[in-house]
């Protein structure tokens, strides 16, 4: 029954992933087992540590792996929330845009902004407004 349902979904255009964070995919690989169990607010610091050293290429690799994995599961469309802040600047957004273009024939990628640092701080808001 599940096989039949899956095939009907694929025949009707495929699965849709309505909420993803492809720029953060696979970043936990760089965290220790202890760090992976920290509270969410502490994990944000770990993400900042990752983002401090991540290049556009790093983000492209994460996003591309995610897209290929999604395609493998029958997903044909996704909305990914990309970090835009004072650490990432535009790196994750540029990478997501690049991968959107690269896979446009096979995968419909929508890009949304993740405002994890908020918009009340003038610097954070300025960076966000530059890219949306």
Predicted feature residues:
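Generic intrinsically disordered, low-complexity segments enriched for polar/acidic and small residues
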Residues: 16-19, 47, 78, 90
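Histidine-centered catalytic micro-motifs
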Residues: 13-25
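Active-site gating loops and adjacent loop-to-helix segments of metal-dependent hydrolytic enzymes
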Residues: 25-59
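Active-site loop-helix segments enriched in His/Asp/Glu that coordinate
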Residues: 51-132
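Histidine (H) residue identity feature
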Residues: 19-21, 39-41, 103
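Histidine-rich, glycine-flanked metal-binding segment
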Residues: 1-13
